[in-house]
Amino acid sequence: MPKVVITHAVEDINRWLQGKAERAAAIESGTGSNVTDYVAADGSKNIAVTADVSDVAAMKSMLESPSPEVLGAMQDHGVIAPMTAYIQK
């Protein structure tokens, strides 16, 4: 199962971290599992999320055209576009 790394900036790190359960559920809706959050060591507002993904096409689709629920969670968590996804090969 390939691993995906998603990076982007956020408005507020603490606000973003509080949304862990919702974020994991959103990523799991795109066939992700083992969701892990990372914050930048330099104290910036850049973050990364990793997940194991069983269907890479479904994950890409979810990231490119998020459902209203996923989009709402992103807005609530202060996600700042653009998001970049890296896929393990």
Task: Pin down the residues of each PLM region.
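Short S/T/G/P-rich N-terminal loop/turn motif that feeds into the first structured element of a domain
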Residues: 1-89
